[in-house]
Structures are given as C-alpha cells and as structure tokens.
Amino acid sequence: MGDPLLPGSTGLGSGGTAAATGGTGTTGTGLGSGGTSGTERPPSPARLTHTSEKHPKVTLTELNMLRRHRELCDVVLNVGGRKIFAHRVILSACSSYFCAMFTGELEESRQTEVTIRDIDENAMELLIDFCYTAHIIVEESNVQTLLPAACLLQLVEIQDICCEFLKRQLDPTNCLGIRAFADTHSCRELLRIADKFTQHNFQEVMESEEFLLLPVGQLVDIICSDELNVRSEEQVFNAVMSWLKYNVAERRQHLAQVLQHVRLPLLSPKFLVGTVGSDLLVRSDEACRDLVDEAKNYLLLPQERPLMQGPRTRPRKPTRRGEVLFAVGGWCSGDAIASVERFDPQTNDWKMVAPMSKRRCGVGVAVLNDLLYAVGGHDGQSYLNSIERYDPQTNQWSCDVAPTTSCRTSVGVAVLDGFLYAVGGQDGVQCLNHVERYDPKENKWSKVAPMTTRRLGVAVAVLSGHLYAIGGSDGQCPLNTVERYDPRQNKWVAVNPMSTRRKHLGCAVFNNYIYAVGGRDDCMELSSAERYNPLTNTWSPIVAMTSRRSGVGLAVVNGQLYAVGGFDGSAYLKTIEVYDPETNQWRLCGCMNYRRLGGGVGVMRAPQTENYMWCAK
C-alpha cells in the first residue's frame, strides 16, 4: 500500500457522473399550448412570487442618504451642542425610547428639535448611524460611552454587543472595574461573567490596584464565595489585610465585618497563631479576637467539630477551568475533511465545533495567543499555503491570516517565543527543508535558517527555548535523525537520533521529555514509542501503544499524554489512548466522531468567560 498521507498515493481520481433526460412532453404553463393529453384542464393562473433579499439593505442605504443630505428629516436631536438630523419613523422603529417620545403625549412629540441630556454626543451619533446602517464598531475607546447611551435609548442589541466586547476584554487587572460598570448599568449577564472570572482568577486579581480600591461591600461579595479559587485560605486572609492596610485609617472599622468571611478554621494552626493571632490590628479588635478564638477551638477540639459547622468551616469548591483537545481536519473515507471536534477530558466527551472553510489533510496545528491555527495541508486536489485561525470564544474560523510563502502539506507547526513556526513538509514538487515563522502582530511570515535535511511528515516540539524537528521522510525513506533550532543563533544542529525511523509520527513534550510515538518506518505502521532526554541527549524506549498509528496526533491535556487517531495499516482510526508514565502503560479512553489520519491536534484552555459556543451552529 502507498503512503496514505501523500496525495499521489491515495487513490484519488476524477469520477464521472452521467445524467439522462426523459421525454416528458410539453408542460402547460398557461402561456402556450399544452400537451396532447386526452383530458383538457383549465390553465392555472400565471403567478410569480418574489422576495427581495437586497431590498432592506437598499432601502436603509437610501434612507441614510436622505439623512446625510438632510432631506425629509423631521427631527433634529441636540446632543451636547451637536445637531443630529433624523427621521422620527426610523428612530421610533429602532428604539423604544424614541417610540415613546414621538408617539405619546410628551412635549417632544410636537417639537422639531429635541434636546437629549446625559448622553455622549459621539456615542449618540454612532447609535443613530446604526439605526440607519445596521453597522457599528465597538472598541475600547467608545464602549464606556456607548453602553450607557444604548441603555438610555433601549437599544438592546447594542447593549448586548457592548457586553460581549467587555467579556472578551476581561483580565485580572480590569475585571473588577468591568464588574462595577456592569452593576451600574444593570447588565446582569456581564456582571455574572465578571464575578465568575474574578473568582477563578482571584490569586492574580488580589495583586491588582483595582482590588485595593474596592469598597467594602464588593470585597465582601467576592471573598464570601464558595467558588473562590485559592490554594489555601491563607491567601484570602493576606488579600484582606493588603486591602485594609491600603487605607488603615478609614478601613480598620470594617475589619471584623470583612474578617468574618475569611474561613479562619481552615487555616493551618501555625498560620492562625503565628500570623493572624499576632497581627496588631486583629488583636486590637474584640470581634476579631472572637473569630480567632473560634478558629482555635475548631482546630484544637476535633471531637466537637460536628457541632461547630458553619459558613466559616465549609471548604471552598472553586470551579476549575481545564484544558480541551482539538482534532482538526485529516483524511477520512478516501477524502480530506474540514471537520473539527474537541475533547473534554473532564467529561470524556467529544463534540463537533465549527468546521474549517477548507478540507485539510496533513495540516499543521498549533495554539498561539489562545487561538488555534491550521496551517497548509492538502484538500484532496491541491497543496495549500492558506491558513485558518479558530477563536473558541466565538466558535468561528477566520481566513485573514497571511499565507505561508510555500505550499506545505505534512508540515510541522509549533510556537516558540510568540512566533508560529512552519517546518518542512512538501509542496507537490519536492520535499522541503524550508522553515518560516509567523509574527501575529505584523501578520507576516519570514524565513529563518533551513534545516540541514529535507523532511515531510516531520514532527516538531519546543523544549527549553529550542525547536526540535524529529524524523519524517526525506522523500526517499523515513528518517530517525533529529535536529534542533536555536532562534538566538538562527542555526540548526543535529542531536542524537531516535532508535527507529519514523515518518508521520506523533510528538509532544511531557514532563520535560520529548515523546515520539507511532508513525511509519520502511515497512509498516508503528505502535512503538520512545522519549528524548535533553539533559543527556539520549532516546529511550517506552511501552508501545495499544494500536499501530501512522499520522497520529499527540498532545498533553491536563497533565496527561493522549494519542489521537491515525492509520493502523488497514483502517483509519477514531480511537484515542492515554499514557500513564507511572505504570508505563497505554489504555484506550474513547473515540472521536470522525476517523482521522493526518489531522492536527491542539490544546487550549477552556475560555475564561462562559460566553462561548463549543457546539457548531
């Protein structure tokens, strides 16, 4: 059998299709003579139903032109000294606020110039533009004025878009400010998401300036949550004391109110006595001393603990975000595929997500800046240099990434120092040693030093600031050689080879080793596996997988090593197996929805907000 990952040996060919037409006579339309049937039927009335898809857009465009030329305008909005011309009927159709203003008994219903107060004039102009164009750009510079304006005008769609934008901007340095902003404007969903984000990232949030500026009520709301994500209750106490000491004069009166929400009974005895009990501010407050005594009793009298249960003795149970694995493209049932699915180890469940715009086998996949990149591949007919990028927050692929300088399939892709590297592969003419890297800030690829050996079906890995190119084929035979790239010197050097020749192998870094599994040698698909120790520059074997797998994906998810799909010599695989380094054993742990040979795999953190769509629309 030929190499199943090389398009020339897949058995692909152009198939013929035939169409036949039958003699059905003449069909009567009411516009001419009918057929020769012996039974005459009265002609049906002529009818053509038409619904124009472009009519709404054209109409809005013309209405906006009338507004721009101040023609047929029947109202002028005076906002912050700026005059905005408009048509009442358009404003009323888009905004409940304007509808009530112009159709009721309010004085404004009879005025040709209406003054709108407490709203930013630039925001108002953007919102009126949206009413006429259905287009708006929300960005960091305008969202804080757009959202209040949209709330006032009751433009719910814009409120939702602003909240969506703010959800995507959440980080530990601004989540408290966004939370307060959401609370002020009654954006309940944004408030809930900001709360969840704050709880999950509390260890970073507590270091921010926003945290130190919190009013006491908001501080209490945060630290009383059962879902606060902390390693120990000591972090909560330290956070509270940092907040207090930021303005001791004004805040010491609130110490007992806040400290009652710190779960002192869950502290270690050493920390409780040595740190909490000895703190001068705590010792000077009677209510705080009582809280410390309560915690001491809980720790010293274990037999009494069943009678002392309460909110302060309840362990926190944070909701932890795990990692998820994506399987992208590949070869299935004789053709390249565009389908993508994700695996959640916590539920042991595979679900389909949005497919790529192109079918891709031999695709290189990597994650950069929380976005999944699919590089090159083969679509069943052509070698590709195009790239797609997946955003898990929106469940959408975008194609605005600059293409690689060469078409590449069976390419190795990895991320090093904020750059995306594309290594080797083939372009339909020859096997490649070219290497290029992508700068996401510039949306540009640039070439770096080529490898010393041409490699298709190469595996790549990043370890200790170096990029490794492992195995593959030079176009004639599989390789066991390995070379390492140093970006500081822009140079490749050879390291010790693997014990087995492997092309289309799987590769991943796990516990500071590089693992190489499966692939194909000169004769057959492989189940064997080995790992590389960079400290000793040596390869050593590990136990073989349960199945032979060429074109296998290998990835580390939540601290476990997974082998995904591949080809066993007779069938495409959808099984996955996981490796346990302590027992040196592989075990099967489920199946994908699709069989995949030569698909890419990537690992991402589950989105920090809950506003994402894993499932394909």
From Swiss-Prot:
Alphabetical list of Pfam families matching this protein: BACK (PF07707), BTB (PF00651), Kelch_1 (PF01344)
InterPro entries for the chain: BACK, BTB-kelch_protein, BTB/POZ_dom, Gal_Oxase/kelch_b-propeller, Kelch-typ_b-propeller, Kelch_1, SKP1/BTB/POZ_sf
Domain called BTB: residue spans: 73-140
Keywords from the UniProt entry: Actin-binding, Kelch repeat, Repeat, Ubl conjugation pathway
Region (Disordered) residue spans: 1-55
Gly residues bias locations: 10-37
GO MF entry, a single one: actin binding
Intervals holding Kelch repeats: 324-370, 372-418, 419-465, 467-512, 514-559, 560-606
Residue span, BACK domain: 175-277
BP GO terms, sorted: negative regulation of synaptic assembly at neuromuscular junction; protein ubiquitination
Pathway: Protein modification; protein ubiquitination
Annotated SMART domains: BACK, BTB, Kelch
Job description of the protein: Probable substrate-specific adapter of an E3 ubiquitin-protein ligase complex which mediates the ubiquitination and subsequent proteasomal degradation of target proteins. May have a role in synapse differentiation and growth.
Name recorded for this polypeptide: Kelch-like protein diablo
Organism of provenance: Drosophila mojavensis
